Regions:
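Hydrophobic alpha-helical connector segments
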Residues: 69-103, 149-153, 177
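Short, basic, alpha-helical segments at the C-terminal edge of helix-turn-helix-like DNA-binding modules
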Residues: 59-65
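Helix-turn-helix
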Residues: 10, 14-52, 56
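Secondary-structure edge/capping motif, primarily at the C-terminal ends of alpha-helices
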Residues: 76, 110-113, 164-168
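Amphipathic alpha-helical packing segments from all-alpha helical-bundle domains
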Residues: 66, 97-107, 114-141, 148-151, ...
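Solvent-exposed, amphipathic alpha-helical segments
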Residues: 14-21, 67-68, 105, 109, ...
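Hydrophobic/aromatic-rich alpha-helical bundle segments in the mid-to-C-terminal region
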Residues: 120, 124, 139-199
Length: 199
């Protein structure tokens, strides 16, 4: 059966909305059809089974999280500056937080991956590739710090975003911005080759 790529993308976007709203248990072909406002049976014509739908929904979240115009880069003068790392980190936090349903859907997929080895393999590969790409960009642009700095920022910002989107009253917005600045200051040296001072 011939398939429409735009329709497939719309169905995956609907699946992401269902995951964020109803959790993985609520993700059914019928729920996706209803969310996408398409005739019953449409989603089952595009996806062989629920596992395929879950896996492709995870990939779609990452598609939508990509920055427009590719990876951000500064001028050669600012690429190696810790302030630029802080600026980029704020941009990532804002971009991911703005796509709230995508982040929440990804949390549901992560939980589901603990029970579905195929989904776990796909998410592991995708997230590891994302971390590796961030490391390559960071080092390639001559930014301060090393691969461990990037990995620690990845872990810290993921939890900060989780807190912001699920329990927003724990930290006020102004404090979250300060915490991003502090994370960069403590995890990334001022210049390349230095080790951050002990706090």
């Amino acid at each position: 059966m011939r398939q429409n790529p735009a329709r497939r993308a719309a169905l995956l976007d609907a699946a992401i909305e269902v995951l964020a709203r109803d959790g993985a248990r609520g993700l059914t072909f019928r729920a996706v059809d209803a969310q996408a406002q398409v005739p019953a049976g449409t989603a089952s014509n595009y996806f062989a089974n629920r596992d395929e739908l879950l896996t492709q929904a995870g990939a779609r979240v990452y598609e939508r999280l990509e920055p427009e115009g590719g990876s951000p880069a500064g001028s050669p003068e600012e690429r190696g500056d810790r302030a630029r790392v802080a600026e980029l980190t704020h941009e990532v936090v804002e971009r991911v937080s703005t796509y709230r349903t995508g982040f929440l859907a990804l949390l549901e997929l992560r939980l589901e991956a603990t029970r579905r080895p195929a989904l776990r393999a796909v998410l592991t590969e995708r997230i590891r590739a994302d971390v590796d790409a961030n490391i390559r960009l960071h080092l390639g642009d001559g930014r301060p710090g090393d691969a461990t700095s990037v990995e620690l920022l990845h872990l810290a910002m993921n939890w900060l975003i989780l807190e912001r989107l699920t329990l927003p009253d724990v930290f006020p917005e102004a404090r979250l911005r300060e915490l991003v600045e502090q994370a960069v200051e403590r995890l990334v040296p001022e210049t390349r080759g230095e080790v951050p001072a002990e706090g």
